[in-house]
């Protein structure tokens, strides 16, 4: 989840990680904790053992990103019929791969893939923000997914406004133009200020409108809260901090409280508007390094969600604020600075004893990519991830980034996952 897409931005974050992690391996290629993990680390997946250890219900998801037309629609300006056809093709491929959940990005940049009274139609549909595409993409996606036995999770980006820094390029009626005091330019992009209570209230109204209209199975956030840090740049929220941050010892603590409030309030709003609808978040995979906090993972990541994105993802899991978490574990087994095996174990321990379901985010987009190391040239790498994760009973499934790679599967990595682990259909956990 183009750098502006969440997963490709995460790839940029990984380049920071690689540049700053340096030194000794975070956990080396950590000694396997079980026979199953040992086989996985040695490149010998044991799919039957993996399947046998799984619960009858299992998350098997795929993200379908719309920002910059990453996965769907393939380009802006297609006819409504062509867009529908591409959408249903993605759903049909999910069914063939025995997946059970599609996570569709429906509010990528303070816009909408449904007829919202709050925000304009997304430009990913027509090429022009605010132009009616002539159909209801979210309503259609929910109906067509359910007709195929798939869950449809609506994926929202709360605070990202635009992938450029020019407010005049937004529609004249855009809330960000009507309320310029809500907007913070940063890193060549426009963001809503999470420190303003009126902003937090507005983005929740905009998102909950979709929940009220459609029987989505879940609301989904990704890793974007405060923006990823950029050297030499400052996210200018000093005025908001002066007005609202007096009770906090630092601006960082105030920022974390702002995001905590969004998460708690959104969970309550979802339950109020459509009881039983779940709420999940997919954060960057490292909460904190152990060198920063002894409760953290044995990693040397260049990005830590607690410190850099002001997202206390561990707290949300431990305090059961969300129904599920999907940490983006976009590294291979044995990667020195952020070993998949170490992080899978850390998240499993974090979820232990909570009501928060743990699913692991998988970097299918790296499989066969020329710029990736040799581990990602092996079509068995992702299958090894699932085998290793099966040793942790807290792991209740996986989500793959993203739809384009599920469809194309350039080196057969997804086909190998399906053959090794998805021989039979499974329902998602509830």
Model-inferred region functions:
Residues 85-110:
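Catalytic domains of carbohydrate-active enzymes, especially glycoside hydrolases
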Residues 2, 7-30:
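N-terminal export signals
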Residues 313, 323-335, 354-429:
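Substrate-binding cleft of secreted/luminal carbohydrate-active enzymes
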Residues 278-326, 331, 335-339, 343:
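Substrate-binding cleft/loops of secretory-pathway carbohydrate-active enzymes
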């Amino acid at each position: 989840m183009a750098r502006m897409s969440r997963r490709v931005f995460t790839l940029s974050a990984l380049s920071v990680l690689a540049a700053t992690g340096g030194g000794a391996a975070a956990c080396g290629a950590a000694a396997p904790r079980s026979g199953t993990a040992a086989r996985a680390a040695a490149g010998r997946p044991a799919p039957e053992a993996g399947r046998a250890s799984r619960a009858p219900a299992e998350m098997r998801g795929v993200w379908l990103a719309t920002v910059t037309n990453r996965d769907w629609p393939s380009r802006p300006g297609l006819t409504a019929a062509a867009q529908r056809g591409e959408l249903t093709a993605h759903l049909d491929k999910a069914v063939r791969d025995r997946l059970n959940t599609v996570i569709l990005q429906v509010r990528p940049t303070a816009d909408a893939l449904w007829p919202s009274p709050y925000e304009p139609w997304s430009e990913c549909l027509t090429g022009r923000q605010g132009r009616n595409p002539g159909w209801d993409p979210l309503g259609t996606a929910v109906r067509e997914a359910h007709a195929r036995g798939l869950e449809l999770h609506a994926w929202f980006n709360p605070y990202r406004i635009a992938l450029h820094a020019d407010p005049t390029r937004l529609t004249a009626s855009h809330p960000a133009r009507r309320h310029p005091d809500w907007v913070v330019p940063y890193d060549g992009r426009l963001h809503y200020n999470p420190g303003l209570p009126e902003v937090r209230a507005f983005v929740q109204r905009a998102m909950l409108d979709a929940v009220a209209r459609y029987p989505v199975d879940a609301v989904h956030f990704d890793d974007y809260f405060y923006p990823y840090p950029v050297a030499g740049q400052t996210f200018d929220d000093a005025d908001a901090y002066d007005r609202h941050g007096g009770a906090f010892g630092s601006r960082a603590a105030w920022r974390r409280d702002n995001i905590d409030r969004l998460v708690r309030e959104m969970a309550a709003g979802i339950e109020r508007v459509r009881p039983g609808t779940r709420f999940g978040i997919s954060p960057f995979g490292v909460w904190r390094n152990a060198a920063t906090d002894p409760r953290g993972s044995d990693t040397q990541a260049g990005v830590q969600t607690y410190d850099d994105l002001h997202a206390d993802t561990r707290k949300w899991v431990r305090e059961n604020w969300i129904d599920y978490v999907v940490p983006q574990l976009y590294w291979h087994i044995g990667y020195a600075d952020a070993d998949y095996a170490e992080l899978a174990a850390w998240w499993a321990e974090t979820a232990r004893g909570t009501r928060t379901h743990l699913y692991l985010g998988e970097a299918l987009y790296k499989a066969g990519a020329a710029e990736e190391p040799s581990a990602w040239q092996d079509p068995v790498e992702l299958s090894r991830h699932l085998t290793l994760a099966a040793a942790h009973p807290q792991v209740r499934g996986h989500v793959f980034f993203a739809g384009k790679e599920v469809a194309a599967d350039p080196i057969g990595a997804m086909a190998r996952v399906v053959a090794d682990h998805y021989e039979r259909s499974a329902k998602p956990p509830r």
